Amino acid sequence: MKMGHLYSVSDKALFDALNNSKLTNQEIIDIFFSRGILISKETKRKDLALYFSRLTHGFHDFEFLSEILGTYSRKEKSTSCEIPSTVKKEDVIQAAHELCQKINQEGNTADTNILPNGDIELVVKYKKLNLDKSELRQTVNKEATLIIEPSKTGFTLRTPLNEDANIWKEDLLQKIQEETDTEVEFTEISLEHISDHKLRTEFFTELIKKIGNYELLDVTDAYVYHPKESTSVDSDFDRDDDDEEVDFGIHISKASLKGEGVLQSEELHSLYAKGFYIWRVIWRCKEPAVGSDQIELEAQFAEPESCTEFSYIAKGFYKYKNQGTYSKNRTTLSYSAEKDLLQKLENKARETIREISQKAAEEGNEED
C-alpha cells in the first residue's frame, strides 16, 4: 500500500509555492539553477514565481517543492498490545523483518533495529496526502515507530494510534502467529466487556490517582459519552395512542468540561446521573518530592461507545521554578522519561482493568 504521491500540479499551484515564505531565497536560486538559469537577488519573488510557473515542469520539481512545503505530522497517541511469553523472541524478530520487507515492497521505507536494552524497534517512514491543503502542501511526511519490549509476561507491542500503524500492527501480529506453533492470544486494554457506565468512569478515576510515584494534582479536561439506546417496537403488540410516548429525536452523546477541579464539579456529576461516563481525560500529576515538575498526561478510548482502542500520550512537563510556581510553557519529555512513564501508565491501566472486571463479576453474582 503505497501512500499516494503527487505527479502533476497546476501552474497556479507552482506560482503560489514559489511565493510561500517557507521557501528560502537560496532554495529559489537552486531551483532556477537546476534549469541552468542564474537569477539576481534583487529580482522580486513574485516576478521569479511568475516566470518559473510558465516553464515546463517535471516530477522532480514537484517533489523538490513538496518536500519543503509539505507538512510533518504531530506526535500521536500510543496504544499497546500484550504478546504472551509462549512466543519466542526469535519469532518476533523474524516477523518484524518480514513486515519490513513487505512495507518496503509497497514503496515506503521501513527498518528494524535491536536496541541495546533488548527492545525491537520497527521504524516506518511514509507519506500521506491531505487533499484539504493546496496542491504542493498536500504531502504529509509521517513516521511510525513500532516498539516491541520484553516484559515479565512476554512482550509489549506499542504503536502509534492511526489507521496505517494499526494495519502494520495487525500484519505483525499475524506474522508472529504464523511463526508460532500454537495459537497465540494477544491482549489489549479494553472495557468492551463492561457496560456499567459507573464502572467505566471508575476505570479513569482509579487510573489517574497514582501512576507509579506520580500522584494526581488536577484534571483539566474530562470528556464524557452517553450512547444512544436502541429501541425496537414489536408491531404485533397493540398500543394505545393516548399512552404512546413521543420521540423528539434529541439525544446528546458527547460533552466536555475544561478548567480546574473538573472531577469535583456539579456539572460533571449531573452528567453521571444521566448515564454519561468518562471516555477521555487530561490530567496533571507530580512526584511528592519538593521541586518536582508537573507532568501532563492524556488517556482515552478512541472508540468511546465500545470503550476499545485504549490510547495515551505524555504531553510534556511544566518545569518547577520556585515557591510553588511552574513555567507556563510545556516542555517535551526525554525519550527515556517518556518511555518509563508510559510503561507505568500501561501497567496501572491493566491493573485497574482487572480490578474493575472483578468488581463487575461480583456485582453480577449478587444480582443472580
Residue ranges, per PLM feature:
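Intrinsically disordered, low-complexity, charge-rich terminal extensions
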Residues: M1-G154, T159-D368
